[in-house]
């Protein structure tokens, strides 16, 4: 009995000496000034806050991915637009080149017609023709039958520079040769069909106005000028007589 009472007293004394209520001065001091527990608590709080905000991170990632997809689609759309614009620009450049070539061709045709008209006016003036006071009848042709080289009536560029009120002369095909048979005449008496040819070349070959007409002033020699020795060596019997030109005496 005594032994049990003594052990109980020692246990009671030991408990009272080494145990103390919370908040008393006998409590052991925290390690490192108690900062370890505070840092652990802060880490736990940060981890908890990060775990609670996981849905926000996912939403932000989804928004960034959607923005990248929109930018990628916009770049692809811009690339297609640039390619379409490049093709359209090349087509327009080709059309402009063709139009420019056609413009140069029309300018050459216009200059040729003006030169022919001036030459014709000079020839008519040299013959004393009163063509300025005459009346011209202009026959309007259909667009399908009108040639590309035919001048347009009333065009200011085709009119002579110093002559006012002068209409473009009518172009008439050259008369057929006397020896050639008529289209309806022949062994069979039927018309011959020919393959269609280029109207521009045919018109240029049939219209005598397109070929330049030479006059005496265009040859550049005088009437009393001596002929070359090659002409003299042929003899007078082989030379054609020219009554308007004075031939030099033969030795």
Swiss-Prot record:
It is found in: Nucleus. The keyword Kinase does not apply. Residues 50-72, 142-213, 228-251 are annotated as: Disordered. There is a cross-link at residue 214 (Glycyl lysine isopeptide (Lys-Gly) (interchain with G-Cter in SUMO2)). GO terms for biological process: apoptotic process; apoptotic signaling pathway; chromatin remodeling; DNA recombination; DNA repair; positive regulation of apoptotic process; positive regulation of DNA repair; positive regulation of DNA-templated transcription. Pfam families: INO80F. It comes from the Eukaryota. Transmembrane segments: none annotated. One of its GO terms (cellular component) is cytoplasm. Residues 170-181 have a biased composition (Pro residues). The modification Phosphothreonine is found at residues 172, 207. Signal peptide: none annotated. The modification Phosphoserine is found at residues 167, 180, 188, 247. Keywords: Apoptosis, DNA damage, DNA recombination, DNA repair, Isopeptide bond, Nucleus, Phosphoprotein, Transcription, Transcription regulation, Ubl conjugation. GO terms for molecular function: DNA binding; protein kinase binding. InterPro entries: INO80F (IPR056513), TFPT (IPR033555). Appears to promote apoptosis in a p53/TP53-independent manner. Putative regulatory component of the chromatin remodeling INO80 complex which is involved in transcriptional regulation, DNA replication and probably DNA repair. Interacts with NOL3; translocates NOL3 into the nucleus and negatively regulated TFPT-induced cell death. Component of the chromatin remodeling INO80 complex; specifically part of a complex module associated with the N-terminus of INO80. This is TCF3 fusion partner homolog. It comes from Bos taurus.
